[in-house]
Amino acid sequence: MPRSSATARKSHSNRHDNGVVGSGKKVSKQKSNGHLNGNHANSSTPTSGPSSQVDWPSSRSNSDTAIPTTAAAAARLNGATENSKDIRGHLNGYAKGTSDMSYGQANGAVPQNGCLPGDAARRTEKPATASKRSGSSASVNPLHLASTILKSCPMYDTIAILIFLLQLPPMVLTLVQFLFASLTFMPPSGASAGSLTSNFDIFQGPAGTPSLGTMIAMDGFCLLFWGLFMWTWAQNFALDLAHVQVAITLGGGGSGKNGGVNALCVGIVLVLHLIRSKGIQDFVMGHLLSAKIISPDLLSQYSHLIPAEFRRTEPQSSPSWIRSLLAVHILAQAGTAMARRSMAKNRAPAPPRTGKRIDTEASAGSQTQFDSAFESGASMSSYIGPDGQFITPATHKDGRDRLISAKKRRRQANQVRSRQPFWAALASTKVTVMREYEHSRALSKTARGLTMTEDDLQGVSLDDGLVWITDVDSSTIRFAAGDFSSPDDASGSGVCETGRLSDDMEPFYVCVNGAQWATATISKVPDARKGTSAVHWRGEISGLAPNCAYTCSFMRSDTDEEICAMSVKTPATSDAEQVSSISAPPQPTYRPSSPTTTLKNSIINAEAKLNEKRSRMKKAKNDHKLVVSKIRKELENYNHRLHSGTDENRQKQRSLQLERNIKQTEEATAALGEQLDNLENIPEEELEEWTMQKAKYERELELLNSVKEELIAARSAVAREVSSLESELNSTVQRRERLQGRRTRVNEQYERIISANAQGLNERERRAAEQFAREQDQAKLEANFNEQLASITQSIQEYQLRTNQLWQQSAAIEQAIQQQQQQMLMDSAPLTPEGNLPGTNPLGDTPSLALAGLTTSAPSSRSLLGLNFPPLKSSPLQHASSLVGATSSHPASPTQTPSYLQHFPTSPLANASSPFDPDFVYRDRSFSNRSGRSSLYGFDLIDSSRRAPFQFDLSEAASEKRRSSGSESNGPNLGLRPISSPFPRAGSRASGSGSGGSGSGSGSPSSAAGKGI
């Protein structure tokens, strides 16, 4: 049954966001404009002050009132677009000014009613009927009103939709489930574009729905439960439960106290699955047959009556993963909705028993949806009214009441959708389809309503005349029009009749807010018929006030028929001076002004602009006078300076300029000096910081040095280890070579044995062969030794000859020195004329002592006949030789002829290690490499009385001979060694004589023997 009139009045202003036809009175739209002449009270549309005219941005972007006629739908559609940047020409009278511009209607439509192009012709034919219909309120037929209201039957709707869904094929069912699942991610109806990016809408859930995070969490949990714990029969049953959820949602079974609907639908699906289950069928049939309740004959007789769908011969198969995912999502959201519904029911107080079915989830979500919309639009300090005027909080006193009314309307819309969602969706679909159809029909001549410019209309022939806005200024509106001539006008152009217009006359005139506008100029485009341009007329409406809304009507000049009407709002002026000088117009109402008011405002605006222009002209004139007088004075000054100026004056000016530059330079230099002084004085803080940094740097440097020392020590240790390892490696290599040599000898012996055995020799012959081989080796060795002995003997003989020569030279030199000294002493005179001084002992008294001293010290003199001999260098071997009783002097006379072939004294180094030992490389160079020229001036004396019989080592002699091959001595360098047994292996580091008599100076035979090589 229809609701009461009070309820109808409350819901009359409701904007059904999705085109839902709610319960209420049928709205009757008037066909003519009753606001042009100020007759607002005669309007049949019930209003409650400004609240019925304001459209909030959050609810008017995609919303319209329930529209009973297609004409009203088209009118609503044509007035729903705004633009804030681009001001271009639009066809069919649809104009855009600035962002403040309101709705523009086309083809004879004013802001309150819109009609198609055909309505203008029909209104021309029946003007009286239209005016009569506009002046009276249409009566409402109760039967027609009752037929437009659907009774809420959620149980029937839900069951019907469930039966319909169960009969669909699997592919269609999958598509339906996908569409239904996608609806959970859609934004709420009536939400603005700003609310889509609101954090509240995304995470808190708009329109009572759970948040995105909650949905994802529930889907994941249900999917895990689906894959782990549900078998095939349970999965197929869950798929049909998803169909139940879709049917309950579309049929409204979840609203109010409809728990019975849910249980009934679930029971139907459960019974169907139990009947279709093969296991249950086998169990029931087996139990009936075993209990003999039904005989097999009776069962086979009536089994053909059971539908084929119920007779399963094979078990059910698992559903596809696509259907499983969709079913999991739908069931998860159903469980979430049930939980939210129970929580809201527990929190909310007990509702009064009014008999109304209320969806607690939808009612709880209405507040959420409104809050989210209010959050997204709370930052707006003003909004746009129906006339394009910005309504600020200062001028809008009842803003809170409007918020409350919008809140109530949104809650009512949610309640209507929750009661009859399926039929509401059908009604919304119908309204949307009809709206698009009327829209395409109304704009079929202009490329289906797309925004077009004059360039897009080149070459397009239009049947009816069209007028469109090309530019909107603060005080002017420019428009263009097509060709208004018709074939009837062309046929009757020869006869000038009343109502017919010539080609040069204006085919239409302009009315602004119902008053014919005298300042509107219309001009014909020259040569418009010759070309293909659609523009035939251009015009301009001037004398308008800025920031005001106007309804511009274009009327035919011959029939006074209205061509089109549009609502345009002029933008605010951008000139700050004009805004400050011109008084602001009174606050416009929410309806167009009357013609008288419009004309008065236009006159006031024109006078204000005229006064402003006059004041500006006067101000500009005064400014120009001042500028001209100033320029004249400057010109006279320059002329005077030009005529009176001389070279002297120019030089003075130049000197003054230079002095000025010098002064500026000095000031700059002083400033730079102060800066330098400031820079030289180091602040204490920086100095302390520098000291700290320096100490830190020194510590780090010490640490670095210590680390470097540690590194060097580590490297040296590693180097020592490496050297020791290398020495070990060398010794190992030598041992390996010896072993390899031994192995070679053993192999040779083995081969000889093998060869001997192979030749059949006996053991005696083999031993004889070995003995013969040994004898041959010994013979070779003996021959080698004999050769070495012969060479050594020859070398000894050569050394003896050279030694004799050296002794003879030494004796001659000593005799010459003694004779020279004696001659000097004999011929010497006293140093003073008086003779020898008292207390002195002349040398002549003791000639024997002096001669003995000279004779003794002669060999140690380092200057002999102008030759400088190097001083004798002490050697550690001299100390070693002194231990065996060797003397440091050589008292032997040169006349003695020592027998060098007698016994040599035993060397103290006779027990020294072999020269092949490792310490052989550290031998003193003075023992092995003496210069051969040193034998010319001295020779190491050898005491023959202390010598043992001469013996030598052949191996040592051979090695010494090889080492002395690079010496400067001409004679052979043989290492002689006094030994007690023939061919001993023990050698001395200082045994033998030097390389070819390379010893120097005189000395004791023991020391010479110790220094010999």
From Swiss-Prot:
Keywords: Coiled coil, Membrane, Transmembrane, Transmembrane helix, Ubl conjugation pathway
Annotated Low complexity bias: 1003-1013
Keyword Transferase: no
Biased composition (Gly residues): 993-1002
Localization per record: Membrane
Chain coiled-coil ranges: 597-806
UniProt name for this protein: Probable ubiquitination network signaling protein acrB
Organism: Aspergillus terreus (strain NIH 2624 / FGSC A1156)
Origin organism lineage: Eukaryota, Fungi, Dikarya, Ascomycota, Pezizomycotina
